[in-house]
């Protein structure tokens, strides 16, 4: 392993090859995926029988592997999304086996490919061309693009049935912003029908068509914990699966008699196979971690009948696995690369819970909250092994997400540099059901931030090997919002802060983010600024910029369209107006990341981020490991 005291370890970690978005060919003999084993993200195709990995692209696909790929119906080309240096204003391109690339759909806004007709005649995709994310089709013979839906709220997951006659998707036509319903329409978008599978206010959506197209696998959280079910188009009835003990969602049909579901418990995500004749289900026999099959509506079954999935743990990087449901045996199709490292070199995750009423012992400086309901909050602690160890509090993004027992490269970078890392699944996180997730509605900057601070207080009290004079908050996206908020709400707790692609001015965010983020994020959680101006101002970190009382590093991609770079610039201006000085010896530091949007998987861009983060922490609080 490289020395942990120089730049070699950062470069070695940033250079670890990463696979993304495995997608299965129509005949089940190949898997297309993004892989950066060459040092740059490229499209590769894996032969599942021989294990041969062939590189199709040579710089034509995006550097950042954020967006998924889909096979063409003939199995001789793959569709991918292409943007401009991470701005996510995707067009849809195709690449064939000899590396030839051509544009297929070029439109304003963001395009999101969701379905390829099995006869190869057309594509179905989402686009924000006209404002909101709606569904469109592209006809290969005529070259024409047709708008299929025109909803005020975003439409998600549109997918053609196997016979090409129907379209399944999810949207919301009710006045309840928390609601989502599953719909079926004719393939041209006509005759849309709400299946009305869940109660108003719950979230329901399609996951996969059955091979014969007569049934639809759906997910719904009406009972609180999510559940998977199979809807029969002929009888207009749904059969729900599972006993309701865990938060679950539908993944895909395996065949006509079995489906896969995803199950969240504590900080792990496991796959469950359900027998549709008996209703019995069992978890796949894999080590506890995170197992996933990739994009929805992409059956993960290869030609020999095995299920292909990605599996990872805190110390084992993602690998591609073929799992035999008949005997619960599995083999690795594509092993993870470790470079100069071994799995034992990485820090493992300890899962624990803490009781929180959303109000920590640390003084509240921005908004004074009364105690909320006391809830059990889950968290993960990564021990760097350094004694004493500085602590990095690392709230997740989303906010509709959670931290789990998977390999996290940023966490391992910090741990190898001697910083222990705390991740907190605050109220509002996923994996705990609808009620827990909805705790965050109308309360950004409230109890969820108190949960983060309470968990930090807990580990500092319980682990005497943590150095309470070297505590830093670091987060990206909504985690960046949390980093800003922690620094202005609980400045006494932290010795430095790092806010990456974070929100600072909620009204500016509302005005300048993409349309589907405006409705499905900002309006859903906070309402509209003109209807709720006080809340928008009160919960914006920039309102309290003068509360920053420790060195702050601000990082933001210049091409970010989810959280525009204006968010960082506004906070910088507020600090300067309050008399704060910028620079390595100043009160705050500021970096705009060129040719980058809302984070990046590109190896060079990751290394840039690692160096900025490592240098700031070393200068400002002292590296955990010299």
Write out the residue ranges for each language-model feature.
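Active-site-proximal cap/loop segments of hydrolase catalytic domains
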Residues: 429-626
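Conserved beta-strand scaffold positions in the cores of enzyme catalytic domains, especially
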Residues: 351, 421-423, 590-592
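Sequence/structural signature of beta-propeller modules
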Residues: 1-11
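Peripheral, non-catalytic segments that deliver or gate enzyme domains
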Residues: 10-20, 26, 30, 34-67, ...
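Short, Asp-centered acidic motifs that coordinate Mg2+ and/or phosphate
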Residues: 390-391, 420, 472, 496
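Structural cue for short, hydrophobic secondary-structure segments
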Residues: 394-397, 423
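Conserved alpha/beta-hydrolase
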Residues: 418-433
């Amino acid at each position: 392993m490289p020395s942990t005291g120089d730049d070699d370890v950062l470069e070695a970690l940033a250079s670890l090859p990463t696979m993304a978005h495995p997608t299965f060919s129509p005949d089940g003999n190949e898997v297309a995926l993004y892989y950066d084993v060459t040092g740059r993200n490229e499209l590769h195709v894996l032969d599942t029988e021989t294990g041969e990995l062939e590189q199709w692209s040579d710089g034509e696909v995006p550097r950042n592997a954020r967006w998924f790929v889909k096979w063409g119906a003939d199995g001789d080309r793959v569709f991918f999304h292409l943007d401009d240096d991470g701005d996510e204003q995707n067009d849809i391109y195709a690449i064939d086996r000899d590396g030839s690339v051509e544009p297929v759909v070029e439109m304003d806004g963001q395009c999101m490919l969701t379905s390829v007709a099995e006869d190869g005649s057309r594509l179905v995709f989402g686009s924000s061309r006209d404002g909101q994310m709606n569904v469109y089709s592209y006809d290969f013979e005529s070259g024409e693009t047709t708008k299929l839906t025109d909803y005020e709220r975003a439409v998600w997951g549109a997918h053609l049935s196997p016979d090409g006659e129907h379209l399944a998707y999810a949207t919301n036509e009710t006045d309840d912003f928390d609601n989502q319903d599953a719909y079926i329409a004719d393939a041209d978008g006509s005759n849309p029908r709400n299946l009305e599978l869940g109660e108003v206010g719950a979230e329901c959506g399609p996951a996969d068509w059955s091979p014969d197209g007569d049934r639809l696998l759906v997910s719904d959280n009406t009972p609180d914990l999510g559940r998977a079910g199979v809807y029969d188009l002929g009888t207009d009835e749904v059969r729900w699966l599972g006993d309701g003990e865990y938060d679950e969602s539908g993944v895909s049909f395996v065949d006509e008699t079995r489906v896969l579901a995803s199950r969240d418990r504590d900080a792990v995500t496991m796959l469950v196979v359900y027998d549709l004749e008996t209703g019995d289900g069992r978890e796949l026999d894999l080590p506890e971690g995170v197992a996933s099959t990739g994009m929805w509506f992409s059956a993960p079954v290869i030609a020999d009948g095995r299920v292909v999935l990605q599996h990872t743990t805190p110390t084992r990087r993602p690998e591609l696995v073929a799992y035999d449901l008949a005997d619960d045996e599995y083999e690795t199709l594509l092993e993870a690369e470790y470079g100069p490292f071994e799995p034992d070199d990485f820090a493992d995750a300890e899962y624990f819970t803490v009781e929180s009423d959303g109000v920590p012992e640390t003084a509240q400086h921005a908004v004074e909250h009364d105690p909320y309901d006391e809830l059990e909050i889950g968290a993960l602690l990564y021990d760097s092994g350094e004694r004493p160890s500085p602590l990095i509090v690392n709230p997740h993004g989303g906010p509709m997400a959670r931290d789990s027992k998977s390999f996290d490269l940023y966490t391992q970078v910090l741990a190898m540099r001697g910083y222990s890392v705390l991740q907190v699944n605050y109220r509002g996180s996923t994996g705990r059901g609808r009620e827990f997730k909805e705790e965050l509605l109308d309360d950004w900057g409230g109890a969820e931030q108190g949960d983060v601070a309470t968990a930090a207080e807990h580990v500092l009290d319980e682990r005497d090997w943590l150095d309470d004079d070297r505590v830093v908050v670091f987060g990206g996206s909504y985690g960046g919002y949390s980093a800003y908020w922690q620094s202005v709400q609980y400045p006494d707790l932290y010795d430095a802060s790092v806010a990456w692609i974070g929100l600072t001015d909620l009204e500016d965010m509302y005005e300048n983010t993409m349309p589907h983020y405006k409705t499905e994020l900002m309006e859903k959680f906070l309402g509209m600024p003109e209807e709720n101006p006080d809340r928008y101002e009160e919960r914006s970190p920039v309102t309290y910029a003068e509360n920053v009382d420790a060195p702050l590093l601000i990082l933001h991609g210049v091409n970010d369209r989810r959280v525009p770079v204006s968010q960082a610039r506004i906070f910088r201006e507020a600090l300067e107006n309050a008399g704060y000085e910028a620079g390595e010896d100043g009160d705050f530091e500021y970096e705009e990341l060129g040719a980058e949007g809302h984070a990046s998987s590109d190896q060079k861009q990751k290394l840039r981020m690692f160096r900025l983060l490592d240098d700031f922490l070393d200068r400002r609080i002292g590296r955990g490991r010299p």
